[in-house]
UniProtKB/Swiss-Prot annotation:
Belongs to the peptidase M16 family. Disruption phenotype: Embryo lethality. Its main location: plastid. Zn(2+) binds at H240, H244, E321. GO terms for cellular component: chloroplast; chloroplast stroma; mitochondrion; plastid. Residues 1-143 form a transit peptide. This is Stromal processing peptidase, chloroplastic. Cleaves presequences (transit peptides) from chloroplastic protein precursors. Initially recognizes a precursor by binding to the C-terminus of its transit peptide and then removes the transit peptide in a single endoproteolytic step. In a next step, pursues the cleavage of transit peptide to a subfragment form. It is an enzyme of class 3 (hydrolase). Binds 1 zinc ion per subunit. Its cofactor is Zn(2+). GO terms for molecular function: metal ion binding; metallopeptidase activity; mRNA binding.
Length: 1265
């Protein structure tokens, strides 16, 4: 089970309002089950982002707590990055793949690890502000350039972290009278000083923001303000169809691909977005790429070619996408949106559309929709990136887009509707292909009109009317809705409240958001401190209060999940805690703690202003503009937060916060706001111990009764908690130092006690207790740091009589969250106050503990104290073990309800000979475990020589080495006899077993299909499962294609030949070449299986290359339809085996190199990436990992030849005996004979679409490429 990354991130989620934050990961995020644009927070760092509090009880550890455990995440197994030491986000084959319907996009806003106590990822100072000085500061803040009639949006997500509790927080200064305060709060917030806005004569609006991360690259996004919400009854899905046809039909976009540019597109309720990520200049000629990128976007949006052949290709692609998207998560999302927005089209206009309509449209129908909506005044262009000459960019925009639409429409003067309102949009004359202004002979339909109808964007987006959940609304309570399905595993209920968006444009607006943030941040602690039994009634309780630009409203949601048999108690507990918070409010201690945390975290965020990626900034601005919030940069966000913080009072916080919760706390009262909807999603059957599967029944009346009974339960005020200032006192530290005499000792093989490499800035040390330490000073993330402990062993060290012991043990440690004499709550608050986020993870080959911290207020020292206490005085609790075991029992039982997980699980069992260490532990294995066995399984790994700590951050040499000696050096040395556990042999199953091909059939109301194809590979360092060292035979390896290799060899002369020789002798040879090979195979799979044959919508090739285990494997994942999936599997096998007959072309290798090198360059500014590079640098079980693997990485990629790629390819076992495949089919007739399409029915081409995040984010179409 790959990285069993569990994410029980109990946290607060808010809509971003201040400024985006980027932690170095600007890749499009994976599937977010929660809908809406929300950002996870830790109350530890209450940040003004989506007001969401999430409390997940199994781990009873707040999101800010030190050990928030995350149940198995499906990441980290099949997709380990080939670059040394870096683990790419991936999925565990045993757990299946998260086929996110909407997730290829990043979330707008904050992207950062949240302060939290131990998150189990196994799978896987500002003094009080003076109001007057704040006013002076405000008047000096520079404002941005404003475009005509352009609403200013607000925005940055507030940091997640919480600072040391201060009881001396002096709130409203007495010298400020109410009139002055009112005047101050009415002042407008400052606009982003570098954000340039403008509008062309034809109405096209544009925004330009210089941003240096990543360097020499920029983002260009064309947002057309039309989406599924604008479709008529017979047009459902047509906006998405146009996205496909326009984007993939653009020749100018295709030409950009050779420059290193990446592009994609997606459709949502309220808009369609085409985006290009491009270098600023071409690599060789240094030609400016801005004009070419703008020209491509112009062709895509305003000059598409609606060729019949392209329309038919995309019709087939979308129909395939529709079936692939139809997971149970998508269906749940549909249910939530249908009931939340039952009064308008948001509840029934899902972007993917309706199958029966998609099949019917002709080219003319599609073109007419484009003509109606695709015009300059209905679009906004965003350009964010490494820009040094804004006037030149403006000139390029005018030159490329300026003539569009001028010949056939009046220029809109304002965004308000015309005389015909929204209907005017449907009366616009037909413009051929939407190319107004570029054609001459095709104006016959419009030339004789005396007056053109003005085309304008809607004044309100999305153009729908809502029934608001406001007190006094004369609407009857809608009965709870129940969605039952056999593929659901747990009970989940959502109570929704829907109100208008409150624009954040003044200091008073920001103050209200801050007060709500403080109030809602308390909820997770309320629940976590009260429910500590081994079988708590709920799995998670989550309160979300967030703005949604895509839905045009603010939604507050209480979500309760639980095991079905516990659902009534879970609902009672949740509403009881909400009522307690509403009735008694937050305490003085909570107010000071959360306020301090917000100020400290926003200060840290402001210091990171130069490290936010362009795509994060752009997404944030786009969402903020949709909500009409004022956009500020991080520095402005911090200054304004400081300004309003000093005016906040406890009474106002509780008054403002209570209003948010009234729809729950006052439920049933005549004056209470009515919930917009109550929706329960439940399984049809549940597992009952000793009985098996039995029917699960629930009624609307029972739900109402459970809510009311929870509200009637007696409640008491929240007690104050004592928060430790430190986990180890100075006197204790002195005593330990005297006892253990920590010091640095010579590093094995060097004779030196300190190795420092000037080129990389990496320093290596070894402590007298055996712990190896690597650190790198980095200023790219100001005053921030990250630390990781890696302990060799992991699940591979589990024995046949302790299956699951390591993974359950790590989860147990996370669930308990205690160290020394401190309670879990004290440890959590310690982490909150010091802005520490800690996570635990167990993979197949190691256990890891990671800490993110700031260097403010001794944050690094606090993180080291926590690590010391975990190593020296961790506490193992029986009830924590019970919760951990129950979690994995539930997780195992849910496998048959997931097509992807069930298919992947069966494949892994077949390929690895039933080895349970690579899949979820079975109920039988789990029942045989006890607290002592899991504790021993985990702690036996913690032997000095088996532990390596790496740290990257903005610290000084003196600071870091003092912490290393004080807190790591004083960890008790291992006994001489102590050795980390060995591992039982890992074997691939022999072909004689006849399990090379298998199938899984899943009964479902809807049809879907997926497949996995896998086989053996070496590990990253050239070792194989058979014990071979490939470096010993690299010179004897068979060559792939004599003709090719011979001609290429002739090109290698002198230095080139020496370079190739050096590459083949380098320890990272197979890591580098396998990475390039994966890129090439991925490209071929998409081109052949998806685009040419049209057999799939989504296909990928991934390599899992271990570092410590002598094996690896490759996996091809493909989704399809039951009628095509068998041919899709055959096509994937043909591509995989076809590299000899269809030899690799130089352009394929060049593109693979460019992709990986660009990714490497972009990631180098991230502390987390450097931490990955440092992994295993001193590990005795990874002897080939050395500094050259980091220093020479770029030159290794550049030196790789086609012959080298074939040397790597020949190590993949792709013959029929070694290759394993498993096909999963879901449908009403699953298990019966599936009709396979004939050759004539096979489509010629296919492609994929996109998805943003948010409630119903699975509605958004997938990326187009």
């Amino acid at each position: 089970m790959a990285s069993s990354s569990s994410s029980i991130f109990t946290g607060v989620k808010f809509s971003p309002i201040l400024a985006p934050f980027n932690s170095g990961d600007s890749r499009r995020s994976r599937y977010l089950k929660d809908s809406r644009n929300k950002v996870r927070f830790n109350p530890s760092s209450p940040r003004l982002t989506p007001h969401r509090v999430r409390v997940e009880a199994p781990s009873l550890i707040p999101y800010n707590g030190l050990w928030a455990a995350q149940p198995n995440s499906h990441k980290g197994r099949l997709k380990r990055n080939i670059v040394s030491g870096k683990e790419a986000t991936g999925i565990s084959l045993s757990q299946g793949r998260n086929f996110c319907l909407t997730c290829k996009r990043n979330q707008a806003g904050i992207r950062r690890a949240l302060p939290s106590a131990f998150v189990d990822r196994t799978a896987f100072s500002l003094s009080r502000s003076s109001l007057t000085s704040s006013l002076r500061k405000h008047s000096q803040i520079v404002n941005a350039t404003l475009g005509p009639d352009e609403p200013h949006a607000a925005g940055t997500a507030w940091p997640d972290g919480i600072v040391a509790e201060r009881q001396d927080l002096d709130l409203l200064p007495p010298e400020i009278d109410s009139a002055e305060l009112e005047a101050f709060l009415g002042c407008e917030l400052p606009s982003h000083p570098k954000l340039h806005r403008g509008q062309l004569k034809n109405g096209l609006r544009y925004l330009i923001l210089p941003n240096k991360v990543p360097p020499n690259r920029f983002e260009a996004h064309m947002e057309v303000h039309v989406g599924s919400i604008d479709e008529e009854e017979d047009e459902q899905g047509i906006a998405h169809m146009i996205e496909h046809v326009a984007f993939l039909g653009s020749k100018k976009r295709e030409k950009l691909l050779g420059t290193g540019a990446r592009s994609n597109a997606y459709t949502d309720f309220h808009h369609t977005v085409f985006h290009i990520h491009s270098p600023t200049h071409t690599k060789d000629s240094e030609d400016d790429l801005f004009p070419s990128v703008l020209d491509a976007l112009n062709e895509i949006a305003f000059h598409p070619k609606f060729l019949s052949s392209r329309v038919e290709k995309e019709r087939r692609a979308i129909l395939s996408e529709l079936q692939m998207m139809n997971t149970i998560e998508y269906r749940v999302d549909c249910q939530l949106l249908q009931h939340l927005h039952s009064e308008n089209k948001l509840g029934r206009r899902f972007p993917i559309g309706l199958e029966e309509q998609i099949k019917k449209w002709d080219v003319d129908k599609i073109r007419k929709f484009h003509e109606r909506w695709y015009f300059p005044a209905n679009a906004t262009l965003y350009i964010v990136g490494d820009i040094d000459n804004i006037p030149r960019i403006v000139h390029n925009i005018e030159a490329v887009f300026g003539k569009n639409g001028l010949d056939n429409e009046s220029t809109p003067s304002s965004p308000s509707p015309g005389a015909f309102g929204a209907m005017a949009n449907f009366l616009v004359p037909k413009l051929p292909a939407g190319l107004g202004g570029t054609f001459s002979n095709e104006k016959t339909n419009t030339a004789d009109q005396s007056k053109m109808i003005k085309r304008e964007r809607h004044a309100i987006r999305p153009p729908v009317e809502h029934n608001w959940s406001l007190p006094g609304t004369s609407v009857d309570l809608k009965p709870p809705q129940i969605f039952k399905h056999e593929l659901l595993q747990n009970f989940a209920i959502n109570m929704f409240c829907k109100i208008p968006v409150s624009k954040v444009q003044t200091f008073g607006d920001l103050r209200n958001v801050l007060m709500k943030r403080i109030f809602l941040s308390a909820l997770h602690f309320r629940i976590n401190t009260r429910y500590k039994s081994s079988n708590p009634p709920f799995t998670s309780v989550e309160l979300d209060h967030s703005d949604s630009g895509r839905e045009g409203c603010t939604v507050t949601t209480l979500t309760v999940t639980a095991e079905p048999q516990n659902w009534q108690n879970a609902v009672k507990v949740a509403v009881q805690e909400v009522r307690r918070l509403k009735e008694f409010g937050v305490t003085r201690g909570e107010l000071t703690r959360y306020m301090d945390a917000l100020l400290k975290d926003s200060e840290h965020l402001a210091a990171m202003i130069d490290n936010v990626s362009s795509v994060d900034n752009l997404d944030f601005i786009m969402e903020s503009d949709a909500l009409s919030h004022t956009v500020m940069d991080q520095t402005q966000g911090h200054e304004t937060l400081v300004a309003v913080a000093g005016t906040v009072t406890l009474e106002e916080v509780n008054t403002v916060g209570a209003k948010v919760l009234e729809f729950i706390s006052d439920f049933g009262r005549p004056t209470a706001p009515l919930p917009a909807a109550i929706v329960a999603c439940v399984p049809t059957k549940v597992h009952v111990d000793g009985v098996g599967e039995s029917d699960f029944n629930i009624s609307p009346d029972e739900i109402i009764e459970s809510v009311k009974s929870g509200l009637l339960a007696p409640i008491e005020a929240e007690p104050e908690l004592e928060v430790p200032k430190e986990l180890i006192s100075q006197s204790q530290l002195k005593e330990l130092t005297l006892q253990r005499n920590p010091c640095f000792v010579p590093i094995p093989g060097s004779g030196l006690t300190k190795l420092h490499d000037k080129e990389t800035g990496i320093t290596q040390l070894r402590l007298s207790n055996g712990i190896a330490v690597n650190y790198k000073k980095s200023t790219t993330e100001s005053r921030a740091g990250v630390m990781r402990l890696i302990v060799g062993g992991g699940r591979a060290a589990e024995t046949s009589d302790s299956k699951g012991a390591v993974v359950v043990g790590v989860r147990t440690l996370s669930e308990g969250g205690r160290v020394g004499d401190f309670s879990r709550e004290q440890v959590e608050l310690f982490c909150v106050n010091h802005l520490i986020n800690c996570s635990l993870e167990s993979t197949e080959e190691f256990i890891a503990m990671e800490f993110r911290f700031t260097l403010r207020d001794n944050g690094m020292q606090a993180a080291f104290q926590l690590l010391h206490m975990v190593l020296e005085r961790s506490v193992w609790l029986e009830d924590a073990f019970d919760r951990a075991r129950q979690l994995y029992l539930s997780y195992f039982r849910s496998i048959p309800k997931s097509l992807e997980r069930a298919t992947a699980h069966k494949l892994m069992i077949a390929m690895l000979n039933g080895d349970e260490r690579f899949v979820e532990p079975t109920p039988k294995s789990l029942q045989s475990l006890n607290l002592e066995s899991v504790k021993d399984a985990v702690m036996s790994h913690f032997v000095g020589d088996n532990m390596e700590v790496s740290i990257v951050g903005d610290f000084s040499e003196e600071e870091i080495e003092r912490c290393i000696l004080d807190y790591l050096g004083t960890v008790k040395a291992s006994h001489d006899s102590a050795k980390p556990p060995g591992s039982e042999p890992i074997l691939f199953r022999q072909p004689t077993a006849g399990l090379q091909f298998q199938q899984v059939f899943l009964k479902d109301t809807d049809e879907r299909a997926c497949a996995y194809i896998a086989g053996p590979a070496p590990n990253r360092w050239g070792f194989t499962v058979d014990g071979d060292d490939l470096f010993q035979s690299v010179s004897k390896l068979p060559v792939a294609h004599d003709g090719l290799l011979k001609s290429e060899e002739q090109l290698l002369e002198g230095g080139d030949r020496e370079l190739q020789k050096k590459l083949r002798a380098h320890p990272l040879f197979f890591g580098v070449t396998m990475g390039l090979l994966a890129e090439i195979i991925n490209s071929r799979l998409f081109t052949t299986v998806r685009d040419s044959l049209g057999l799939t919508y989504d296909v990928s090739f991934e390599l899992n290359l271990f570092d410590r285990l002598n094996l690896g494997w490759y996996v091809i994942s493909v989704t399809s339809t039951p009628g095509k999936v068998y041919k899709a599997v055959d096509a994937c096998k043909s591509v995989l085996r076809g590299l000899h007959s269809n030899q690799i072309a130089p352009r394929e290798l060049d593109r693979a190199k460019r992709t990986l090198l660009m990714r490497h360059e972009a990631e180098l500014k991230s502390n987390a990436y450097w931490l990955n590079l440092l992994a295993h640098l001193q590990a005795s079980s990874v002897p080939r990992k050395e500094l050259s693997c980091i220093k020479e990485l770029v030159s290794l990629y550049e030196a790789a030849s086609i012959e080298d790629i074939y040397l790597a390819y020949n190590q993949l076992r792709v013959d029929e005996d070694s290759l394993y495949s498993c096909i999963g089919i879901a449908g009403a007739q699953a298990g019966e004979e599936i009709t396979v399409l004939s050759e004539e029915e096979e489509p010629e081409d296919v492609f994929s679409g996109v998805v943003p995040v948010g409630r119903g984010s699975s509605m958004t179409t997938r990326p187009t490429t």
